[in-house]
């Protein structure tokens, strides 16, 4: 099931990022102590009452010296392309400016619902100032104060009225859904075409020519798969040409629907920061992951080339040390037979459950090998461990003091669980809870 998406749009200095941070709260920072994952604050998840949604802060756009109208056009374009609902932000202290009118005209051209938020209404006396904003043509303006957190609930109530109905996907549980993510032109569509052996999507050397995400059902050795293709950036307008950071937006909806994510990188161009950022979203979403090095045919090779490249991948993707690596050439259709065994393994491990009795034996042995940490004369005690979820496998440790379960010791326990049970291809979530 795909969560609805809200985009916050408006001219500069109306408080878009403040409202974004109010809505997402502490959810923005998820894996601060995980090396290699840089957190991009322009896209996050939010919750309001019974609703879960994704939210885009278009204030994060950085187009350098581009004229104002180009920046706003870029913001509106992202919102119109990616969002189910648009929150149009204006500044209640300034009244309607020419720039607000420009944004309004752009949003009128879209068929997306627009909710008008009038920010910086910091006290009840200022509410009289909002009525002029009716003239923008988007119905009732909602007075809000980002700095004081006022009116956000009413704004989200209105936005939620426009969320599309959520439909459960009609694929069987044993079907493996996987997506291919990566920056533009690493060969995602070419990989799907090579696997299927037919031209089911548009393939072009120009980034962004795949029209929409395309689900393709495919059977291989009696296992049914659903492949979700996402093209990274669409070639529509300035922002998609000006910055690659928005390629993550195209990937995120596909990640959400997947069991297994193939992180595709370009052997010829090597690994760049954008690759790590996109992979980080799949990791944070708790999906099973296979790293696919495409265009392997373009690399001059000797007996050590693959090992050297694998070492480079491990160095750059330290947070994906559990993910297997496949080296393929979509163009030459070589080594593609290595993909499905890895997808199957990652998918199976993502759903794997282990017996509590065996798990606790492993943890007991681990503690005997490396005793738990101490603090001010007190030692961390792990009373009991149990697996509480799959996709990804999630383990709860009942302890005497949650604060003493340091990241480094948690990492050690994760490694011992992996050594005992495998779990290659899937992240593991470890949670410490105080025993009552």
Curated annotation (Swiss-Prot):
Give a yes or no for keyword Repeat in this entry: yes
Q: Where is the KH-like domain?
A: 352-436
InterPro entries documented for this protein: G_ENGA, GTP-bd, GTPase_Der, KH_dom-like, KH_dom-like_a/b, P-loop_NTPase, Small_GTP-bd
The processes (GO biological process) annotated in the record are: ribosome biogenesis
Instruction: Give GO MF terms, alphabetically.
Output: GTP binding; ribosome binding
Q: Per its UniProt entry, which superkingdom is the organism in?
A: Bacteria
Its lineage reads: Bacteria, Bacillati, Bacillota, Bacilli, Bacillales
Family of this protein: Belongs to the TRAFAC class TrmE-Era-EngA-EngB-Septin-like GTPase superfamily. EngA (Der) GTPase family.
Q: Where is the EngA-type G domain?
A: 4-167, 176-351
Q: Please tell me the species this chain comes from.
A: Macrococcus caseolyticus (strain JCSC5402)
Q: What is this protein called?
A: GTPase Der
Quaternary organization: Associates with the 50S ribosomal subunit.
Q: Which PROSITE patterns match?
A: G_ENGA
**Which key words are in the record?**
GTP-binding, Nucleotide-binding, Repeat, Ribosome biogenesis
Supply the gene name: der
SUPFAM superfamilies according to UniProt: P-loop containing nucleoside triphosphate hydrolases
Q: Does the keyword Iron apply?
A: no
Q: Which residues bind GTP 2?
A: 182-189, 229-233, 294-297
Q: Indicate which residues the UniProt annotation says bind GTP 1.
A: 10-17, 57-61, 119-122
Q: What does this protein do?
A: GTPase that plays an essential role in the late steps of ribosome biogenesis.
């Amino acid at each position: 099931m795909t969560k609805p998406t809200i985009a916050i749009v408006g001219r500069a200095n109306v408080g878009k990022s403040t409202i974004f941070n109010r809505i997402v709260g502490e959810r923005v920072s998820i894996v601060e102590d995980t090396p290699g994952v840089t957190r991009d604050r322009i896209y996050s998840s939010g919750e309001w009452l019974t609703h879960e949604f994704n939210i885009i802060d278009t204030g994060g756009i950085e187009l350098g010296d581009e004229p104002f109208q180009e920046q706003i056009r870029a913001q509106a374009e992202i919102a119109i392309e990616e969002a189910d609902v648009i929150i149009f932000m204006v500044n209640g202290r300034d009244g309607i400016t020419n720039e607000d009118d420009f944004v309004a005209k752009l949003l009128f051209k879209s068929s997306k619902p627009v909710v008008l938020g009038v920010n910086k209404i910091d006290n009840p006396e200022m509410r009289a100032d909002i009525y002029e904003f009716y003239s923008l043509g988007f119905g009732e303006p909602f007075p809000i104060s980002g700095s004081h957190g006022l009116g956000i609930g009413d704004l989200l109530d209105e936005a939620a009225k426009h969320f599309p109905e959520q439909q459960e996907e009609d694929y069987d549980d044993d079907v493996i859904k996987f997506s291919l993510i990566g920056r533009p032109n690493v060969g995602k569509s070419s990989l799907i075409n090579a696997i299927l052996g037919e031209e089911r999507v548009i393939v072009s050397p120009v980034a962004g020519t795949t029209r929409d995400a395309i689900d393709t059902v495919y059977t291989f050795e009696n296992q049914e798969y659903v492949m979700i293709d996402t093209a990274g950036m669409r070639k529509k307008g300035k922002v998609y040409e000006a910055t690659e950071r928005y390629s993550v937006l195209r990937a995120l909806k596909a990640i959400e629907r997947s069991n297994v994510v193939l992180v595709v990188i370009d052997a010829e161009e090597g690994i760049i920061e954008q690759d790590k950022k996109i992979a980080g979203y799949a990791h944070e979403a708790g999906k099973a992951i296979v790293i696919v090095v495409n265009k392997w045919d373009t690399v001059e090779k000797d007996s050590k080339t693959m090992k050297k490249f694998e070492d480079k991948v491990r160095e750059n993707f330290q947070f994906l040390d559990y993910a297997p690596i496949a080296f393929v050439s979509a163009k030459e259709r070589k080594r593609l037979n290595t993909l499905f065994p890895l997808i199957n393994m990652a998918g199976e491990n993502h759903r794997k459950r282990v017996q509590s009795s065996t798990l606790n034996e492993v943890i007991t042995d681990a503690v005997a090998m490396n005793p738990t940490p101490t603090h001010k004369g007190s030692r961390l005690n792990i009373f009991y461990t149990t697996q509480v979820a799959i996709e990804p496998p999630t383990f709860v440790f009942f302890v005497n003091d949650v604060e003493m379960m340091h990241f480094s010791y948690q990492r050690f326990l994760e490694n011992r669980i992996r050594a005992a049970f495998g779990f290659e291809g899937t992240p593991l979530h470890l949670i410490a809870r105080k025993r009552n």
